[in-house]
């Protein structure tokens, strides 16, 4: 197994998984890959500093390394044949479903490019596109919106986080990131630290193309103080429109 230390998401999400296991009466399999710290490391510079290469809106490899790859590896080990995977996109997120469906191959399956061996001299990896999942979207099929989901879970013993994904997700708007820096200070500080290191060690690379996270953290907003209820999924970078 792997020692669990924590995540860069709202800690409520971890409790949600425990609550769901009790509610449905079934085990939920936890999968894990590299830590975020390891995913962004790119060796050492001449001065001994660790080079940090950050994902950003133009290259979001964090999703592949920390979500898709661990799921694929678990599937490969335990199932290893194409299966239907039910994706939780809601009725207003048809655009996201279309993006996924546009990637289907001629067999209407998604493929994952994975290492399947080594070259004859053992110096290079051999890669193959492996068919592994057929996505299904039951919430879209049944025309389920967020209010339907909230009503369903109302008064049930499962608590959900207000916002999903990493607190410093680069898809989020500036106001939302500022709110996260105040609500989850220690987690957001990790993003600030990594960006400062990346600026020094990897071609001035940053998380967000609009504003450095250190500036977002120190930004003194004038006027309204935001609460969780003031933000939508569009602010989180996942608008279904």
What kind of region is each of these model predictions?
Residues 1-241:
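Nucleotide-activated chemistry modules centered on ATP-dependent adenylation/adenylyltransferase
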């Amino acid at each position: 197994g792997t020692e669990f230390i924590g995540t860069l998401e709202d800690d409520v999400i971890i409790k949600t998984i425990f609550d769901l296991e009790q509610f449905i009466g079934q085990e939920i399999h936890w999968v894990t890959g590299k830590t975020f710290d390891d995913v962004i490391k790119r060796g050492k510079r001449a001065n001994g500093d660790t080079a940090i290469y950050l994902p950003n809106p133009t290259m979001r490899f964090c999703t592949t390394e920390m979500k898709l790859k661990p799921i694929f590896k678990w599937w490969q080990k335990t199932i290893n044949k194409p299966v239907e995977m039910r994706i939780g996109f809601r009725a207003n997120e048809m655009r996201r479903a279309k993006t996924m469906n546009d990637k289907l191959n001629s067999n209407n399956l998604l493929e994952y490019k994975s290492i399947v061996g080594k070259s004859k001299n053992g110096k290079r990896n051999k890669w193959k596109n492996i068919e592994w999942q057929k996505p299904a979207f039951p919430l879209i099929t049944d025309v389920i919106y967020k209010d339907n989901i909230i009503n369903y879970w109302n008064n049930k013993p499962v608590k959900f986080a207000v916002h999903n994904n990493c607190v410093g997700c680069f898809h989020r708007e500036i106001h939302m990131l500022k709110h996260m820096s105040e609500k989850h200070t220690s987690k957001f500080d990790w993003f600030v630290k990594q960006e400062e290191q990346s600026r020094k060690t990897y071609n001035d690379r940053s998380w967000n193309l609009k504003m450095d996270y250190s500036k977002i953290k120190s930004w003194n907003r004038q006027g309204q103080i935001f609460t969780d209820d003031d933000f939508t999924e569009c602010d989180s970078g996942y608008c279904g429109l």
